[in-house]
């Protein structure tokens, strides 16, 4: 029998997104993340329209999708605190620490996490790891500092690769760092952010997910 891995993974992403949407309560200020899994969440939100008071988005891409479905997206400065933020991840470890930023929205995502009372991360089982770092670590950097930051990362043992033809919503660029040992995500997140010219990096350990909703390959839901 022919097995389509991508279609199956999409089904799992949709399953996790649908489960997370059940956490939406009345009069909620909802933060919406970015990425393929969140795309399924956005589609599901039409069933919760009456409960959502305000929507805050972490990217221009998600904002376009939300507005296309008739949602009024509000700037975080006007929304204030986010009651619930839902987003995906590129990797998630046993401590609910994450690597994010494959979609280049890591800075706004990290701001939304910081402003949220609760952060639910939605993933399929392929994103669950014991140790972070197999997925290249995205770092958003000020363009003029790109080469300088790359040299500092090499000193830390990483192999930075410039993500060509990618400009973030903030007008910056992305370095994807390969082969970086992430034994202590909290320490490395702090260390990388102290390099001059770094806007932020894709490790979410200072404020990890409060809850992880994971769809397994046998189409079950596991809550971490």
From Swiss-Prot:
Gene3D superfamilies, sorted: 3.30.70.260, 3.40.50.1360
Keywords, ordered alphabetically: Isomerase
Gene Ontology cellular component terms for the protein in this record: cytosol
UniProt pathway: Carbohydrate degradation; pentose phosphate pathway; D-ribose 5-phosphate from D-ribulose 5-phosphate (non-oxidative stage): step 1/1
Broad class of enzyme this protein falls into: isomerase
GO terms, biological process: D-ribose metabolic process; pentose-phosphate shunt, non-oxidative branch
Protein task: Catalyzes the reversible conversion of ribose-5-phosphate to ribulose 5-phosphate.
Protein name: Ribose-5-phosphate isomerase A
Gene: rpiA
């Amino acid at each position: 029998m022919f097995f389509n891995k991508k279609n199956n993974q999409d089904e799992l992403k949709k399953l996790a997104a649908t489960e997370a949407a059940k956490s939406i309560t009345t009069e909620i200020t909802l933060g919406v993340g970015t990425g393929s899994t969140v795309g399924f969440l956005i589609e599901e939100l039409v069933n919760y329209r009456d409960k959502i008071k305000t929507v805050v988005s972490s990217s221009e891409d998600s904002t376009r999708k939300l507005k296309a479905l008739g949602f009024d997206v509000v700037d975080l400065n006007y929304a204030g605190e986010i009651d619930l933020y839902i987003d995906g991840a590129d990797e998630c470890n046993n401590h609910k620490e994450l690597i994010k930023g494959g979609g280049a929205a890591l800075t706004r995502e990290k701001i939304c996490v910081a402003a949220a009372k609760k952060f639910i991360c939605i993933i399929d089982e392929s994103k669950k790891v014991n140790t972070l770092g197999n997925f290249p670590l995205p770092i958003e950097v000020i363009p003029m500092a790109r080469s300088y930051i790359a040299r500092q990362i090499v000193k830390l043992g990483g192999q930075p690769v410039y993500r060509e033809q990618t400009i973030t919503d903030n007008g910056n660029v992305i370095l994807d760092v390969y082969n970086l040992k992430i034994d202590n995500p909290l320490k490395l997140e702090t260390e990388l952010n102290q390099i001059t010219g770094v806007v932020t990096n894709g490790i979410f350990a200072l404020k990890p997910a409060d809850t992880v909703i994971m769809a397994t390959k046998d189409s079950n839901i596991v809550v971490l």
